Amino acid sequence: MREYLNFLKYIKENGVLKGDRTGTGTRSIFGYQMRFDLQKGFPLVTTKKIHIPSVVHELLWFLSGSTNIKYLNDNNVRIWNEWATVDGELGPIYGKQWRDFNGQGIDQIADVIQMLKTNPNSRRILVSAWNPCVVPSEKISPQENVVKGNSALPPCHAMFQFYVANNKLSCMLTQRSADAFLGVPFNIASYSLLTHMVAQQCNLDVGEFIWSGGDCHIYNNHIEQVNEQLSREPLALPTLKILRKPNSIFDYKYEDFEFENYNHHPAIKAKISV
């Protein structure tokens, strides 16, 4: 994934120093796009190890509509723990907005599947996780926001749109805030996986995954790790194999996915900014 290394390098060389909500500080750029041909391999970063169970379980959790971390913790995924209440609640985050937007019974995922099957040329095949009604206040903690009925965090990956051409399904993700070192590799993998799943459900081949970022940043305490990653040579991409076709997009299990030939460099640890 040379595209991803070029992204890191561009931010490192062109980013401006900015403060941020966490107090860590960043090097930041505004506006960047990467394109991945899903016919040429699954875009899983190889210059460091990506924890595949976290990617898959988080996506299945989103699709379930759940906003409690119990499922994730039961599967040894703890990427959301810092923001949850003592009861494991995160408020109306991604899954809630995807499956029951604003609590009004609007299932955006089911609607997208139906539109792809019945009107694939539509330019309205999209899902938005951004709901201004529940955007949290920056003046109080994530947990306090949840108590007030808001989400613990606003969605970073805010909207995604599907596009069909030549019987191939492509997906474009718009990400308002992009943690380039820790977050973006997960986001690329997650939405590429979702594109494969939706394509299977709609009897389509996969096309491209397009990632578009707004505020793209490297945290100041990740610079050393970024330099380490940039020194590594990318390896061949793995291949995703989906072992069965469930009855619906909501019926996939972790065991349904196999990432063949995922060769990678060692993991690089970095502290997440809360």
Curated annotation (Swiss-Prot):
Superkingdom to which the source organism belongs: Bacteria
Q: What keywords sit in the KW lines?
A: Cytoplasm, Methyltransferase, Nucleotide biosynthesis, Transferase
Q: Does the keyword Ribonucleoprotein apply?
A: no
Instruction: Cite a single GO BP annotation.
Output: methylation
Predominant location of this chain? Answer: cytoplasm
UniProt pathway annotation: Pyrimidine metabolism; dTTP biosynthesis
Q: What does this protein do?
A: Catalyzes the reductive methylation of 2'-deoxyuridine-5'-monophosphate (dUMP) to 2'-deoxythymidine-5'-monophosphate (dTMP) while utilizing 5,10-methylenetetrahydrofolate (mTHF) as the methyl donor and reductant in the reaction, yielding dihydrofolate (DHF) as a by-product. This enzymatic reaction provides an intracellular de novo source of dTMP, an essential precursor for DNA biosynthesis.
Q: What is this protein called?
A: Thymidylate synthase
Where does this protein come from, organism-wise? Francisella tularensis subsp. novicida (strain U112)
